[in-house]
Amino acid sequence: RLTENITSKRVNKVLDLCAGSGIQGICAANKANSVTLVEINHQTIPFIKFNILLNNVEDKVRIEEGSLYEPLGNETYDEIYTNPPFIAVPKGWNFPIAGNGGENGLDIINKIISGYRKHLNINGQAYMIGEAIGTEKEPFLIDELRKELSNDFKITIILDFKFSIEAHLRRSSYVAIGMEKMRGDDADNLFEKYKDWIKEVNAVFVYNYYLKVEKTKQGQGSIEVIDMTTTWSKNDIPVLINDKDYQIQEFPQYYAICRNGKVIAQLDEATLKFIKKIDGKMTIEEIYQNLCEENKNIVNYLPKVEAIQSLSEACGILKVRNIIEKM
């Protein structure tokens, strides 16, 4: 999604932090005089070099191996792109470096946004996507933005959708278990063990967000929160939007909903079966019960309450993708 927001406006210098494969910076090289990619994971560097050569941008793009701004000295940039590690991970979990955002998910993100003051030019812009835990009202990230940047930066944050912190923790439990190469049923034990962590961080939801920050003159900052999230309950009735206007394609690991030849959503098999049952009459709970009667294996790894909650959260994502709406 971050690459979709790379504009065609010509700029001098672009920075891609937490570069990963380097895709953001490589795409930005088409409109920039120079691009710097920063990546801390040494194992990723050969892949970045390959992608640079593959796209014939080696004359514009340089790689710096290190942590965030540390290799950059006092360099400043016109644009900064970041897809950072943002997953909130309780202490003691063995979790992939690519996703581990610390106990509240903001360890890396706070360092990134605080660096905008030093490394972003006046009228320069920074873009970030990710997930952030928060209260029922908003993610904790917004409070950090207010404290750190709101006086001298024009901030726009779009909240796409939100899902329960419990669902986030269960998903993270399975990732952590995979890292430890333990039995799959241990994920349930780990999930129960870390329910206390949910209370400690005082989080209710996980928010998916898109952030744009523009450096202004001193004292001319502002913050705008665009909340597109909607909470679905078991009693809501989903309705398909222009169901004849899209196609479903099957891939080895997932299904894709396409409209006008463009993928607008990726689905697992359970969500696809759920969508096919939407008739504009049944509630989410009724669809779940209908699916259970037809297929005993449908989301059977979750208790009923959590399974319905998972489908409700899927409805929030499908609503953002303009696939369904509430009756």
Predicted regions and their residues:
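A generic alpha-to-beta junction signature in SAM-dependent methyltransferases
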Residues: L72, H119-L120, I278
